[in-house]
């Protein structure tokens, strides 16, 4: 491989890692006890920063002779071109042999094919918490609203049986239970909670 190009919509590479603050043992252990308004505010602030690449990872990538970082370069279009593709950004067209996409995280159970039979029954944060006017966050609102043991909760109590035995021990637990199943540093508190659940 002669070249690797990384495109970011942002004009600057994130430099603040909000996870460092959230990894403190007291925070990871006590986060689930916070009220919904506090959880919502904390996660809105967290998600507003994004996470930078690790220094080691970035240094190794940048040392690669064919590495190129394109900041402020959202993809405006992608079209086939022979055996490859052309990506157009505000800086112009770029031709590639192949594309690898990593476009962010959306934790909406409705997007998961394995949950298609019950997705409409799963409670989301939008169903359980109304943030103050002007502070709604669609990314947070789409997350499942989980019980204390990572269990999926129903929008309607009549649907509880349909969700029995379904747990979200993954990144989608972030809003309800904090850095639990979404980071190695959270497993110390998360695994016992999952087992008890």
Positions of predicted regions on the chain:
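Flavin (primarily FAD) cofactor-binding/catalytic cores of flavoenzymes
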Residues: 3-197
């Amino acid at each position: 491989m002669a070249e690797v190009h990384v495109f970011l919509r942002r004009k600057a590479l994130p430099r603040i890692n909000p996870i460092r603050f959230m990894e403190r043992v007291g925070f990871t252990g006590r986060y689930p006890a916070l009220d919904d308004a506090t959880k919502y505010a904390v996660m809105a602030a967290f998600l507003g920063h994004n996470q930078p690449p690790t220094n080691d990872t970035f240094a190794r990538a940048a040392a690669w002779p064919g590495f190129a970082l394109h900041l402020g370069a959202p993809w405006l279009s992608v079209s086939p071109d022979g055996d490859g593709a052309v990506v157009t950004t505000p800086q112009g067209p770029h031709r590639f042999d192949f594309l690898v996409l990593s476009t962010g995280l959306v934790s909406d159970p409705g997007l998961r094919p394995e949950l298609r039979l019950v997705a409409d029954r799963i409670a989301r944060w939008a169903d359980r918490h109304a943030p103050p006017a002007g502070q709604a966050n669609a990314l947070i609102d789409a997350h499942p609203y989980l019980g204390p043991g990572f269990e999926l909760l129903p929008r309607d109590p009549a649907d509880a049986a349909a969700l029995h035995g379904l747990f979200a021990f993954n990144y989608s637990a972030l809003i309800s239970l904090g850095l639990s199943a979404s980071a190695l540093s959270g497993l110390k508190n998360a695994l016992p909670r999952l087992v008890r659940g």
